């Protein structure tokens, strides 16, 4: 049996569609599972933040309580797998604790989205204690699914982990929800859909707007929109992407990027830096090395009357097959390059 531990639902983020699509896949494949979802009601996010740290901690504690009750009542048995939609999960060590005392052969698997092992991630300031927590995660887990080789290599460089546990699968983009918005007439709209935080450098988008207008004397009448500043429904957001000509990122941290993946599927020209995950996911796309290049790329996109070809970054069914059909691995040793090299 699969014990499925989803993320809390946050409207406007990938958590809602991922939960829906995972359940649809499990039902279609006739996979026996129990979903640990204490509530689908989520309070509004604090202004400027993409999660509510207090609520997500409470939500995860409720999930641990439900899983503990399943261990206590004997509903979890040898051969079962516990799958976390985000394995960076405070309290996950209690699963290993219960496994030890019940002597149940239960696999722990899940997706690693980010962590303090990335120097430019917003949680980097927690590394003093978070690195110990992350080492626990990598120790007690059987298989950890990575969105990209970029994050996998980051983990191997910075944490104690058996590399064989880390499996690159990509993430499931909600293409079915995007199809309705394809084929719209393109307008001179440039989009920045990253979070408004230091690691995404939104102020460079302001400078981009200034320099594009200066170089074209404002003759392109372009709109530069930060979607996080707009109060858009999911449908309105997708419609805006469908009408836009370019999607821009100045990210200093990105392990996958749902927002860019959605935009390029809807025919936006990607204007992306030549770093992080972007060379891996967009190998046939011109990427910029200097800010000035991004200005020229946006002007080129705005002047073009041809629609940029739609791109598919990942196949959701392939991702789900890897998550739920692949046998989990049992690690043989821990590995950390800096220690190995000293021996």
Regions found by a protein language model. Name each.
Residues 1-91:
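N-terminal pre-catalytic "stem/leader" segment of glycosyltransferase-like enzymes
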Residues 81-88, 99-121:
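Active-site proximal beta-strand in glycosyltransferases
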Residues 124-144:
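Membrane-proximal helix-turn-helix segments that form the acceptor-binding/catalytic region
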Residues 139-179:
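Donor nucleotide-sugar binding/catalytic pocket of nucleotide-sugar-dependent glycosyltransferases
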Residues 174-210:
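Conserved donor-binding/catalytic core segment of Leloir-type glycosyltransferases
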Residues 251-252:
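Aromatic "clamp/platform" in nucleotide-sugar-dependent glycosyltransferases that forms part
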Residues 269-272:
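Short hydrophobic beta-strand element within catalytic cores of glycosyltransferases
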Residues 292-343:
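A charged, aromatic-enriched C-terminal amphipathic alpha-helix characteristic of glycosyltransferases
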């Amino acid at each position: 049996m699969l014990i499925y531990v989803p993320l809390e639902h946050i409207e406007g983020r990938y958590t809602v569609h991922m939960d829906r699509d995972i359940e649809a896949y499990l039902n279609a494949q006739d996979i026996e599972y129990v979903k640990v979802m204490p509530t689908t009601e989520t309070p509004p996010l604090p202004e400027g933040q993409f999660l509510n740290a207090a609520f997500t901690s409470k939500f995860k504690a409720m999930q641990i309580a439900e899983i503990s009750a399943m261990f206590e009542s004997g509903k979890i048995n040898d051969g079962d797998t516990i799958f976390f939609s985000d394995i960076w999960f405070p309290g996950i060590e209690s699963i290993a604790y219960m496994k030890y005392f019940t002597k149940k052969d239960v696999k722990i698997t899940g997706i690693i989205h980010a962590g303090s092992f990335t120097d430019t991630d917003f949680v980097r300031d927690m590394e003093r204690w978070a690195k110990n927590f992350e080492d626990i995660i990598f120790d007690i887990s059987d298989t950890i699914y990575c969105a990209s080789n970029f994050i996998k290599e980051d983990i191997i460089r910075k944490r104690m982990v058996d590399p064989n546990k880390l499996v690159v699968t990509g993430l499931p983009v909600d293409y079915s929800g995007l199809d309705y918005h394809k084929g719209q007439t393109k307008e001179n709209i440039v989009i920045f859909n990253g979070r408004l935080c230091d690691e995404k450098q939104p102020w460079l988008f302001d400078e981009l707007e200034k320099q594009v207008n200066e170089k074209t004397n404002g003759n392109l009448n372009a709109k530069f929109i930060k979607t996080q500043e707009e109060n858009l429904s999911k449908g309105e957001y997708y419609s805006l992407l469908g009408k836009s000509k370019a999607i821009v990122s100045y990210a200093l941290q990105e392990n996958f990027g749902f927002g860019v993946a959605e935009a390029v599927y809807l025919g936006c020209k990607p204007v992306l830096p030549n770093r992080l995950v972007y060379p891996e996911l967009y190998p046939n796309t011109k990427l910029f090395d200097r800010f000035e290049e991004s200005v020229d790329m946006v002007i080129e996109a705005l002047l073009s009357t041809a629609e940029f070809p739609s791109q598919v970054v990942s196949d959701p069914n392939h991702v789900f097959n890897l998550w739920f059909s692949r046998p989990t691995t049992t690690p043989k040793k821990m590995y950390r390059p800096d220690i190995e090299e000293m021996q």
